[in-house]
Amino acid sequence: TSSVTTTGTTIFVSTPDETELASAKFQQEIREHIVKALRKEAKSYLPRRLKYLAEKYDFSYSSTKLTHASSRWGSCSSTGTISMNISLMKLPFELIDYVLIHELSHTKFMNHSDYFSQLVKTYEPNYIKYRRELKNHSPNV
């Protein structure tokens, strides 16, 4: 039988030679372990990084939430809750920071107006480049 174990952020897969790697069941099992590893890393890193950036740039938010949405990297509610996709952990650190600054900026402007864009640019001058780069990645696992 196959076995999949997670140690920290390393996923070990052991399968007999005859295992059908393309089977839906096997793929789902692997996906579940990847999500578990991403969630563990995200829980450790993302709230601390968000807090650091908020303090550095004088933003405030009410709470944080980790998600695993399929189409969004993050969001900010009208009550100031910032949701962060665990798949952010698949990205380079500069793109993670861009997404977090983007969401923090929504605590001041709940839209994508010119004022919002200017605020993001103030704290991340490369935001256009990073926004473009982000399109090459997917929050899906």
Q: Where do the PLM segments sit?
A:
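Active-site-proximal or metal-binding-adjacent scaffold patches in catalytic folds
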Residues: 1-97, 107-141
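Walker B beta-strand of ABC/ABC-like P-loop ATPase nucleotide-binding domains
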Residues: 100
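Walker B catalytic acidic pair
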Residues: 103
